From Swiss-Prot:
Protein name: Glutamyl-Q tRNA(Asp) synthetase
Annotated Zn(2+) binding sites: 105, 107, 129, 133
Gene from which this protein is expressed: gluQ
EC number: 6.1.1.-
UniProt motif ('HIGH' region) ranges: 8-18
Amino-acid positions noted as binding L-glutamate in the UniProt annotation, renumbered to this chain: 5-9, 41, 193, 211
InterPro entries, per database record: aa-tRNA-synth_I_CS (IPR001412), Glu-Q_tRNA(Asp)_Synthase (IPR022380), Glu/Gln-tRNA-synth (IPR000924), Glu/Gln-tRNA-synth_Ib_cat-dom (IPR020058), GluQ/Sye (IPR049940), Rossmann-like_a/b/a_fold (IPR014729)
Biological function: Catalyzes the tRNA-independent activation of glutamate in presence of ATP and the subsequent transfer of glutamate onto a tRNA(Asp). Glutamate is transferred on the 2-amino-5-(4,5-dihydroxy-2-cyclopenten-1-yl) moiety of the queuosine in the wobble position of the QUC anticodon.
Transmembrane segments: none
Top-rank EC class of the record's enzyme: ligase
Any GO BP: tRNA modification
């Protein structure tokens, strides 16, 4: 059975781009008669705010979405908040370490920033790590440990190309070493995003991941982790981003683009869903509609392949103006 999910990070309020991703992931699962899971990705507790997790649940319910498993309804694969799943991540870390797939990295933030400022040093996933600490001898590692430096742990990329067919973006091919060895455990003890999301999706039985196109470059790293952990690799679909009228990523300067702000303006959820469906190519006019009414017309082939700008008049209408 197909299983999809939506996994917001509670470091900010859900905006229209998040809502579109949630809606399309939900429709994809429901169209196939599958399961849908809500998970809260609050692994970085310093950046996460519990009230924003509660607000996200309320916003999604208001929009008309439901889920078979989640933090508010429970289910057989809980807990559904990453902050409560650390033991599972530690187990995965131990397995990877025992198989020699990880190594300690002692590079400072300043050194990593220097890498980022070098030509071709920055990828969409951050600085492309050149493998500095991967080449350290045992003696050099002991010397750094003696200096009291707490290392992060990096996953050593194997020398292999990663190719897959994205459900939306089509065939993808990444050369060996793309993006560089990545962190799976930060020096401050926080589990890396790449590992946490793979462990969660694997243990929750997620078969299809629909998410924003900004995460496309994460996919080869996650595929390697699935393989290293002996888990099936899900199908991935990366949605072109929803942008502001100026072509920039959605931000406060674009107006009331959060669901909380739109709700406060008195806009109906059906109006929001109608506009999101229109911007996603599912309907011909941005007319009010409930999510369940879109299930029969949902088709991944109808989704635009390029980023979509929200017209200024649409934002004005959702903010309480006239359409």
């Amino acid at each position: 059975m197909l299983c999809g999910r939506f996994a917001p990070t509670p470091s900010g309020a859900l905006h229209l781009g998040n809502a579109r991703t949630a809606l399309l992931a939900w429709l994809h699962a429901r169209r196939a008669g599958g399961r849908f899971i809500l998970r809260i990705e609050d692994i970085d507790r310093a950046r996460s705010r519990p009230h924003l997790a509660e607000q996200a649940i309320a916003d999604l319910r208001w929009l008309g979405l439901d889920w078979d498993e989640g933090p508010d309804v429970g289910g057989p694969h809980g807990p559904y908040c990453q902050s409560e799943r650390e033991e599972l991540y530690r187990d995965a870390l131990a397995r990877l370490q025992a198989e020699g797939r990880l190594y300690p990295c002692y590079c400072s933030r300043a050194q990593l920033m220097a890498i980022a400022s070098a030509p071709h040093g920055l990828t969409s996933e951050g600085p492309a790590y050149p493998g500095t600490c991967r080449r350290l001898t045992p003696e050099e590692r002991r010397a750094r440990e003696a200096d009291g430096k707490t290392p992060s742990l990096r996953f050593a990329l194997p020398d292999e190309e990663i190719a897959f067919t994205d459900l939306i973006a089509g065939p993808q091919r990444f050369p060996p070493g793309a993006g560089g060895d990545f962190v799976v455990l930060r020096a401050d003890g926080v589990i890396g995003y790449q590992l946490a999301v793979v462990v969660d999706d694997a243990l929750m039985g997620v078969t299809h991941v629909l998410r924003g196109g900004d995460l496309l470059d994460s996919t080869p790293r996650q595929i390697l982790l699935y393989r290293a952990l002996g888990r099936p690799v899900p199908a991935f679909g990366h949605l072109p981003l929803l942008l502001g009228p100026d072509g920039a990523r959605l931000a406060k300067r674009h107006g009331a683009v959060t669901l909380a702000g739109i709700r406060a303006a008195g806009t109906s959820p059906e109006t929001v869903v109608g506009h999101l469906a229109y911007l996603s190519g599912l309907v011909d006019q941005p007319e009010p509609v409930r999510p369940e009414e879109l299930i029969p017309v949902f088709d991944l082939a109808r989704i635009p392949r390029e980023p979509v700008r929200i017209p200024a008049e649409t934002i004005a209408a959702l903010s309480g103006g006239t359409a």
